[in-house]
Swiss-Prot record:
Record text on subunit structure and interactions: Component of the multisubunit TRAPP (transport protein particle) complex, which includes at least TRAPPC2, TRAPPC2L, TRAPPC3, TRAPPC3L, TRAPPC4, TRAPPC5, TRAPPC8, TRAPPC9, TRAPPC10, TRAPPC11 and TRAPPC12. Interacts with SDC2.
Major location (coarse): membrane
Upper lineage: Eukaryota, Metazoa, Chordata, Craniata, Vertebrata
SUPFAM superfamilies documented for this protein: SNARE-like (SSF64356)
Superkingdom, natural source: Eukaryota
Name of the featured protein: Trafficking protein particle complex subunit 4
Entry keyword set: Cell membrane, Endoplasmic reticulum, ER-Golgi transport, Golgi apparatus, Membrane, Postsynaptic cell membrane, Synapse, Transport
Role played: Core component of the TRAPP complexes which has a function of guanine nucleotide exchange factor activity for Rab1 GTPase. Plays a role in vesicular transport from endoplasmic reticulum to Golgi and autophagy. May play a role in dendrite postsynaptic membrane trafficking.
Stored Pfam families: Sybindin
Length: 219
């Protein structure tokens, strides 16, 4: 998908909603004999490369799969501990796929808080009063787009640099938030959004944005 992530950050800098479409991208896959010539360590419930960078395998990469079987955190899909499995000579030769790990929930919370602070700094540094703050950050692989409402809620979209119509999409997400979160009698302001209708309509809006590139009248 050309739209990678959607985040909603409350006025205090707390992450109250997040949606991701991307999967961890495999960087390298290699068959190893015993003993393993890489140093692996457990960090934040993930098995990461700590030493032995080689053949496209980099320090910080996570173990994504073993012998074609996906790894979830520190366990394989059939419930075996990764480090224990790789420490057993009887399991070799073994094929391991490495790649950049998906962000954990704690990391997303921390990054949302950091972006909230950067947004405030950007507003304060403006030579003019009433600055909108950060509206877009660009890298070589994605663009971060941000729309802040009058009440301080921030809607953040990470998308492919070539994706058009993100400004319209941000405002559409705001409409969906107003219609299906704020009008929900069971939803409390500033709290995490757990509304099925919000989820459904957000996904529909993202599909429309990717197909059409923008929103027209009546969308």
């Amino acid at each position: 998908m050309a739209i990678f992530s959607v985040y909603v950050v409350n006025k205090a800098g707390g992450l109250i909603y997040q949606w991701d479409s991307y999967s961890p991208r495999a960087e390298a896959e290699k068959t190893f004999s015993y003993p393993l010539d890489l140093l692996l360590k457990l960090h934040d419930e993930r098995v990461l490369v700590a030493f032995g960078q080689r053949d496209g395998i980099r320090v910080g990469h996570a173990v994504l799969a073993i012998n074609g079987m996906d790894v979830n955190g520190k366990y394989t899909a059939d419930g075996k501990e990764v480090l224990e499995y790789l420490g057993n000579p009887a399991n070799y030769p073994v094929s391991i796929r490495f790649g950049r790990p998906r962000l954990t929930s704690n990391e997303k919370l921390m990054l949302a808080s950091m972006f909230h602070s950067l947004f405030a700094i950007g507003s304060q540094l403006s030579p003019e009063q009433g600055s909108s703050g950060i509206e877009m950050l660009e890298t070589d692989t994605f663009k971060l787009h941000c729309f802040q409402t009058l009440t301080g809620i921030k809607f953040v979209v990470l998308a492919d640099p070539r994706q058009a119509g993100i400004d319209s999409l941000l405002r559409k997400i705001y409409e969906i938030y107003s219609d299906f979160a704020l009008k929900n009698p069971f939803y409390s302001l500033e709290m995490p959004i757990r509304c099925e209708l919000f989820d459904q309509n957000l996904k529909l809006a993202l599909e429309v944005a990717e197909k059409a590139g923008t929103f027209g009248p009546g969308s």
